[in-house]
Amino acid sequence: MARKCEITGKKTMFGNNVPRKGLAKKKGGAGQHIGVKTKRTFKVNLINKKFFIPNLGRSVSIKVSANALRSISKIGLDAFLKKNCKKIENFL
């Protein structure tokens, strides 16, 4: 299964490791020198979480990012799904 949040759609991003050495010019140095850039991945912080749906009377297991889980705990699952244009039936 893909490493992707089922609600927000967040997934692995790609970028570079950029090693820097030297003192910055604004700190009185000769400037920072950048070495060889190497590829890297930024992985999503995913959690398999069970949510209880009271109007259906059952639990649903959803792979959700930590950021989305924080928002769900603040405003509730129904409101968060409505905000992200998702329906609970998609996760059954």
Swiss-Prot record:
Coiled coil, from the record: none
Gene3D superfamilies listed in its UniProt record: Ribosomal protein L28/L24 (2.30.170.40)
InterPro entries in alphabetical order: Ribosomal_bL28 (IPR026569), Ribosomal_bL28/bL31-like_sf (IPR034704), Ribosomal_bL28_bact-type (IPR001383), Ribosomal_bL28_sf (IPR037147)
Keyword Ribosomal protein included in the entry's annotation: yes
Pfam name, any one: Ribosomal_L28
Any one GO MF annotation of this record: structural constituent of ribosome
Cellular component per GO, a single term: ribonucleoprotein complex
Protein's GO biological process: translation
Keyword field: Ribonucleoprotein, Ribosomal protein
The organism's place on the tree of life at top rank: Bacteria
PANTHER family in alphabetical order: 39S RIBOSOMAL PROTEIN L28, MITOCHONDRIAL, LARGE RIBOSOMAL SUBUNIT PROTEIN BL28M
NCBIfam families: L28
Stored HAMAP family: Ribosomal_bL28 (MF_00373)
Family: Belongs to the bacterial ribosomal protein bL28 family.
Protein name, UniProt field: Large ribosomal subunit protein bL28
Organism from which the protein derives: Borreliella burgdorferi (strain ATCC 35210 / DSM 4680 / CIP 102532 / B31)
Lineage: Bacteria, Pseudomonadati, Spirochaetota, Spirochaetia, Spirochaetales
Protein's gene: rpmB
